[in-house]
Amino acid sequence: MNKQKKRLGSMSLCKVVLICLFLSVFSTAWAAVEQTSSKITVTGVVKDVQGEPLIGATIKIKGSAVGTVSDFDGNYSLANVPVNGVLEFSYVGMNSIEISVSGKKVVNAVLSDATQLLDQVVVIGYGSVKKSDLTGSVATVKPEALSDIPANSVEGLLQGRAAGVQVINSSQDPGAGSTVRIRGNSSLRGSNSPLIVVDGFPLGDAGDLKQINTDDIVSMEVLKDASASAIYGSRGANGVIIVTTRRAKEGTTTVSVKQQLTFSEFSSKLDLWRDPVMMAMLNNEGRVNGGLQPLYIGANNSAGVYYPSIEELQTTWTTNTRWDELVFRDAPVSNNTTVSVSSANEKTSFNLSANYYTDQGMYIDDDYSKGGYNLNVSHKIYKNFTIRASNILYLGNRNNNGGMAYWRNPIYPVYNEDGTYYQTTAQDYSHPIAIREHKKDKTKMLDVISSGAFEWQVIPQLRLTSQLNYKYGKSTNDQYLPQKYTQVGTENRGRGVIGNTENQNFVSETFANYSQMFGKHEVGAMVGHSYEWYQYRDSYLTANGFVNEALGNENMGAGEKANNIISNGFSKSKLVSGMARLNYTYDNKYLLTATFRADGSSKFGKNNKWGYFPSGAISWKAHEEKFIKKLNTFDELKFRLSYGISGNQGISPYQTLSRYGTTKYYHQGQWLTAIGPGYESGQSGQDGIWK
């Protein structure tokens, strides 16, 4: 009986164990099923604020390494997303956002540009202010507007983008500079070009600034009136264009490649005569109506050029050359390629970009190319002390051999029967193909721009900045005009020219910025010092009378030594400045800005070395008043009044000095050159005043 009870007890225990095992397995399986059912596949599209899809945006499950990227249409699909999870959306140059899934299988995202703060904070020179707190006239070119502009220069980015700014392309040659004017001209004799400042470096006058890769630019501010530009003194007399280049975003490492092809074409075809007979008939008729002898009569004119008769053109004359098709390209192409790498952590950041640009001119054999790199490095030594360094290298080549004489008479052939170039006379200097293949005009350019700076946050309200900037530029122009086909070359039996120009610019600046709030009062102040040194040198060697033209100007010794010309020039100038600015705001409604700068320039005589440039501006944010807000009409209503004095030192470094001149005299069968005080080339002007 006891054995039976024990057996029954054992069987009951086994049943209990089996039931427990079953329940355990079932609960585990159920948990797995439940866990699987709590994860879903999420799809969606990622766009920017303009509604354009973002290619390569990163979508990641928060708290995990699981993620994906968007395709060419901005679409993405991500599996195993927790129903209550959070997705992180990020993109280079954009603000990252987080979106809760909340069981949704479709999650779309819109990312805003990380540089959108630039629309709110405006760089004004040696500092920045909120856009709403501006008292001077400043135009901002939005960052999103820059990326779609196929321009190869800083000036090109501004064309049509800022009110009051004119960008005039005076030449269609590739690589040619532009004329930039802000609110028109300010001087009859001096410079009218605005100053361009790149990352705090007053780099030079606008117009031919090719060293900066446009893909590196993230914002541009244009200081237009005297109150805004007075902080730059005489250098800002014609306005200031402030350029800010790209910096790495903390916590990211990015590699990007951009290639842009641009095709150009004439807005309208040239209206040229295609029918030589009709052209000749109308020409004769016009000359007769003007009281002149008809030209197309089957005879030579006074210059010895033969013009066939109308009958000859109708019967035996077969030439109808389309010179425009031999001179112009059908569709010139420009190619812009940029590769950039950037990375940043809490202490160190760097951005390196390399660029190569080629541009075909509208004329055949008229080309421009440039290449270089831009390196920016920043390192925080201590929590309140940062050093920065940058270096830009630019190499350029310009070939200016094309063009000329697309208007050449279509009755003239390109070649003679023996393959030589057809010339109407021995003095025919307008054959475009002959000139293109024998003339030489090439320019090589080199620029190096280096900057170093430190920034010390002394206290939360006070920041001290000091920076050194150096620019070196050099260009070499090679020209050769052959003995045939060019007038200068014919008259001088071949002419070779080698021209070299070299310039150096050094700028040292130290300034302090202070800001503080006291209740409804907000005060900002800046005080600084600047020293600038500039030097220019050129030299030219010209040789004439080449016995052998095989090497052109590569063998200048082949020219007759008696006809060689050597010339050179040199100039140097200095500028010492002190500047200060005060910004005051009361109750976020009433604003005051006062600026003062003193410039001491070596270009002026001893009696007027210094120029003083004060400015002031007041502003009223009317939309912040309660009675205006009640109207519910204005998002922003602001009144502004400004006044300032600016001066211009865009004159020759030695214009105010008496200068020795040269003269030639004949002595003992030869011409001699004399130089001395008896031959002044310019009168002194020690009392010359600033403009």
List PLM regions with ranges:
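Short, small/polar-rich motifs associated with maturation and membrane association
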Residues: 1-374, 386-388, 392-394, 449, ...
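Short, well-ordered amphipathic alpha-helices
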Residues: 44, 182, 199-201, 375, ...
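Surface-exposed loop/interface segments of Gram-negative outer-membrane beta-barrel transport/assembly proteins
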Residues: 132, 250-323, 331, 361-368, ...
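Extended, hydrophobic alpha-helical segments in both membrane/secreted and soluble proteins
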Residues: 217, 373-375, 466, 508, ...
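Residues on the lipid-exposed face of transmembrane beta-strands in outer-membrane beta-barrel proteins
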Residues: 245, 339-343, 373-379, 450-456, ...
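Long hydrophobic segments that form regular secondary structure
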Residues: 455, 459-460, 691
